[in-house]
UniProtKB/Swiss-Prot annotation:
Belongs to the UPF0262 family. It comes from Maricaulis maris (strain MCS10). Pfam families: UPF0262 (PF06793). This is UPF0262 protein Mmar10_1128. Disulfide bonds: none annotated. InterPro entries: UCP032146. Transmembrane segments: none annotated.
Length: 160
């Protein structure tokens, strides 16, 4: 197995977890998926070599990682309580709202300050996600950032 097989080649967000979203969130989701597929490191613990397909969902207030091989052979499923991520996701949503409002008419300095705060909260969520995945799935920081964006998209839609 080569290191290049330690990657996601397909990602699906559960349609049942998805509802109508706003334009900005939908754009962020599409960009996160494209960036994730372009470059990621993703390796479930165990003996099964990739590349992998990943389905993300929210079921019964839990985050579901359904990991499969590229041919849809099941590898492993993981469920995580949303509680530890909930505060960070909520903070991220609030900062994103402020950012989108500021982009319309705020001075550049204010937009930059809000964007720095937004990236900081996003990094915090990504770090927490990596910590939650330890012993289950090995991901690099950029992959965790993109997955956090997708988890936020699911969380936003599950809450609406």
């Amino acid at each position: 197995m080569s290191q290049s097989d330690d990657r996601i080649v397909r990602i699906d967000l559960d349609g049942a977890s998805m509802g109508p979203g706003d334009v900005n969130a939908d754009h962020e989701r599409r960009v996160a998926i494209a960036d994730l597929l372009e470059g990621n490191r993703f390796r479930p613990d165990g003996e099964v070599d990739g590349p992998y397909a990943l389905r993300l969902a929210i079921e019964h207030d839990r985050l579901v990682f359904d990991v499969r091989l590229e041919d849809d052979t099941p590898v492993h499923g993981f469920m995580f309580a949303l509680g530890p991520l909930r505060r960070i996701v909520k903070d991220y949503f609030l900062i994103c709202e402020s950012y989108y409002e500021a982009v319309r008419d705020a001075p550049l300095e204010r937009i930059e300050a809000i964007d720095m705060a937004r990236r900081g909260v996003h990094n915090e969520g990504s770090t927490l996600l990596r910590e939650r995945l330890v012993g289950k799935i090995d991901v690099d920081f950029d992959t965790a950032r993109r997955l956090f964006t997708l988890i936020c998209a699911l969380h936003r839609r599950a809450a609406s």
